[in-house]
């Protein structure tokens, strides 16, 4: 599978005279159509990295390749059209008086004809389950509903890449899971590439690969299953999955269970075999 994003020896610091780099000499790629989660403690460089990819920040050194072209000041606006970004706080993203106005805002800026705009707004709101709220004021929505509208606004623009910068962190567990499932559906229906910065285990589990950042550098990349087998998850800003905690408790009480990570279904099967 070809890469839609390639990062090569990328470095950045917010102040030219500061000693440490916020992002230092990182190299990684994102395959077209995959879901890549980026995890790590606060201050590890996650958000800075995606802002460099989106052209919101300019790298001090290194290269960013998007869909076969190296990102430059001359093509940054063109490449930014390929990327949609949803941030942590949806209230900071609303500009329209109604839900449908807000989703239409980006389309108006791109000069999309009115008829096509109406179709795209309707499709995007239906996709995130918010069509019945199209005439509502955004301020009257719940946190989860606001994030759905924010995602609809991005989807309506039909980008190739969707970046979620801790977009589920302010939601309750049920709201987070609903939003993750919506993103997965969008990804499958539109063949979209997803990059998510997250501390949420369900979000990580949904991804194809996980990139771990530590002190501005790439510490490792792995499949979620391999990541969850690590004993030092707390050192990279993640909790142990509940199934890991349960399995360890059972092992401590004498049950012979595998050391490697098991899904809930696999743990259930292992317990049935023991009894």
Predicted region positions:
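Catalytic Walker B motif of ABC-type/P-loop ATPase nucleotide-binding domains
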Residues: 162-165
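The feature captures the beta-strand-to-loop junction immediately N-terminal to the Walker
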Residues: 39-41
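Conserved ABC ATPase signature
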Residues: 137-141, 145
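Helix-to-loop junction immediately C-terminal to a conserved catalytic motif
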Residues: 54
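Conserved ABC ATPase "signature" region
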Residues: 115-133
């Amino acid at each position: 599978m070809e890469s839609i994003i390639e990062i090569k020896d990328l470095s950045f610091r917010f102040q030219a005279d500061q000693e440490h780099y916020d992002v230092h000499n990182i190299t990684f790629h994102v395959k077209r159509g995959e879901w890549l989660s980026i995890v790590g403690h606060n201050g590890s460089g996650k958000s800075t990295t995606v802002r460099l990819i989106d052209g919101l920040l300019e790298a001090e050194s290194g290269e960013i390749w998007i869909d076969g072209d190296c990102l430059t000041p001359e093509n940054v606006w063109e490449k930014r059209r390929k990327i949609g970004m949803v941030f942590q706080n949806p209230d900071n993203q609303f500009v329209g008086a109604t839900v449908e106005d807000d989703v239409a805002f980006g389309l108006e800026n791109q000069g999309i004809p009115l008829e096509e705009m109406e179709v795209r707004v309707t499709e995007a709101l239906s996709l995130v389950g918010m069509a019945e709220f199209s005439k509502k004021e955004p301020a009257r929505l719940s946190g989860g509903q606001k994030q759905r509208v924010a995602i609809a606004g991005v989807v309506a623009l039909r980008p190739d890449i969707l970046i979620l910068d801790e977009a589920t962190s302010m939601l309750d567990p049920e709201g987070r899971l609903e939003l993750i499932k919506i993103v997965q559906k969008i990804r499958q229906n539109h063949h979209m590439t997803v990059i998510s910065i997250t501390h949420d285990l369900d979000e990580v589990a949904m991804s194809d690969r996980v990139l771990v950042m530590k002190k501005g550098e790439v510490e490792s990349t792995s499949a979620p299953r391999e990541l969850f087998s690590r004993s030092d998850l707390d050192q990279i800003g993640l909790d142990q999955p509940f199934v890991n905690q349960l399995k360890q408790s059972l092992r401590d009480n004498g049950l012979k269970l595998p050391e490697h990570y098991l899904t809930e279904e696999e743990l259930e099967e292992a317990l049935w075999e023991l009894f």
